[in-house]
């Protein structure tokens, strides 16, 4: 699963997800992609599940690019522990996804294959998504 090799600080504050995605809102590698319509934390497990769903359907044809990376540590205190006594340990890693962010890109396959592969991938993600096609695409 994806996670940073090393970070400057072990823990982060939760932060707020307001506004639209400032970067990563255009297709850069592939011809087809899925764009986020909501804001949410997408965990490393969800990204991996979506990747597996898409690659299984594509049967090793074409290429898939994951355009989000889980670089935010999400902490959790153990069960039945009273409040206070510091912040909990890092439980998992998540990527902050805002509306407009391209999450996955696919290239080298026909449109119907890409559409179905990305639909299967989108079912594994906690955000509403939209299928997008590159401007210079010709069938």
Swiss-Prot record:
InterPro entries from the UniProt entry: Ribosomal_uL16 (IPR047873), Ribosomal_uL16_bact-type (IPR000114), Ribosomal_uL16_CS (IPR020798), Ribosomal_uL16_dom (IPR016180), Ribosomal_uL16_sf (IPR036920)
Spell out the Gene3D superfamilies in the cross-references.
Answer: Ribosomal protein L10e/L16
Q: Which Pfam families match?
A: Ribosomal_L16
SUPFAM superfamilies given in the database record: Ribosomal protein L16p/L10e (SSF54686)
Q: Does Glycoprotein appear among the keywords?
A: no
Q: What's an example Gene Ontology biological process for this entry?
A: translation
Q: Which family does it belong to?
A: Belongs to the universal ribosomal protein uL16 family.
- HAMAP family assigned: Ribosomal_uL16
Q: How does it assemble?
A: Part of the 50S ribosomal subunit.
Which protein are we looking at? Large ribosomal subunit protein uL16
Organism, by scientific name, is: Christiangramia forsetii (strain DSM 17595 / CGMCC 1.15422 / KT0803) (Gramella forsetii)
Taxon lineage = Bacteria, Pseudomonadati, Bacteroidota, Flavobacteriia, Flavobacteriales
């Amino acid at each position: 699963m994806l996670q940073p090799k090393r970070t400057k600080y072990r823990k982060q504050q939760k932060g707020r997800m307001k506004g639209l995605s400032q970067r990563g809102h255009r297709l850069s590698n592939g011809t087809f992609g899925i764009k986020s319509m909501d804001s949410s934390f997408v965990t490393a497990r969800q990204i991996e599940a979506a990747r597996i769903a898409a690659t299984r359907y594509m049967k090793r044809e074409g290429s898939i690019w994951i355009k989000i990376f889980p670089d935010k540590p999400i902490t959790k205190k153990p069960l039945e522990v009273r409040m206070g006594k510091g912040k909990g340990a890092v439980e998992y890693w998540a990527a902050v996804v805002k509306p407009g962010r391209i999450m996955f890109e696919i290239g080298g396959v026909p449109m119907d294959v890409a559409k179905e592969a990305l639909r299967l991938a989108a079912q594994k993600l906690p955000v509403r998504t939209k299928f997008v096609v590159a401007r210079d695409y010709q069938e």
